[in-house]
Amino acid sequence: MAQPAELSREENVYMAKLAEQAERYEEMVEFMEKVAKTVDSEELTVEERNLLSVAYKNVIGARRASWRIISSIEQKEESRGNEDRVTLIKDYRGKIEVELTKICDGILKLLDSHLVPSSTAPESKVFYLKMKGDYYRYLAEFKSGTERKDAAENTMVAYKAAQEIALAELPPTHPIRLGLALNFSVFYYEILNSPDRACDLAKQAFDEAISELDSLSEESYKDSTLIMQLLRDNLTLWTSDISEDAAEEMKDAPKGESGDGQ
């Protein structure tokens, strides 16, 4: 039987869209990886870049949601002292973690070998470096010990490199710059346990975007305002958490002393 001919770049993009419509995201990833690997030193188009991002986001998102649910059940069973069940849950969680690691390793390898080196426009550089930070952050969510430390350090390096370009080259209202600020602040809050830094970063990004709202382009208005809303929601949540923590520290601390700042 004759081997099917290799699909062209356009055909792979079409097949990725088809897979997206059918919600077959693993196959969508495969089609977009082929596109990324066939362009060599050429940049992906904005459409191709977004398709790749959507494919991976769905594939990783399903596993991250599974991991959170299983971890929550594990905590409940631990608190009840059900050791036998905890052992079963840990094994099952490990299976999900293997899948998460494989997905993250796949996109990180593609970013390092093709996507970051071939990017020339500031927008695409920030997009891919942010993506690199995101997938190292996803690793840091479930890894422990040295692996977690390494993942967190790699997240920081990628986000900082993206931030440097974004602040210099992209307007404060640009959805990619705002998305970077959103994810970087989440990293500070969730992975580094630095709520003050998380709030500072989110507030600065939000305030700068608000001050330049008039310059927001028609095509990015919806994306930008949505991310700004998410930044504001996080700020509301985080500042209330900080206030509660501070109140607890004041209650517990000896008179004349305050709790340590982050």
Curated annotation (Swiss-Prot):
It comes from Hordeum vulgare (Barley). SMART domains: 14_3_3. Transmembrane segments: none annotated. This is 14-3-3-like protein B. PROSITE patterns: 1433_1, 1433_2. Induction: In response to penetration attempts of powdery mildew fungi. It holds the Pfam family 14-3-3. Belongs to the 14-3-3 family. InterPro entries: 14-3-3, 14-3-3_CS, 14-3-3_dom_sf, 14-3-3_domain.
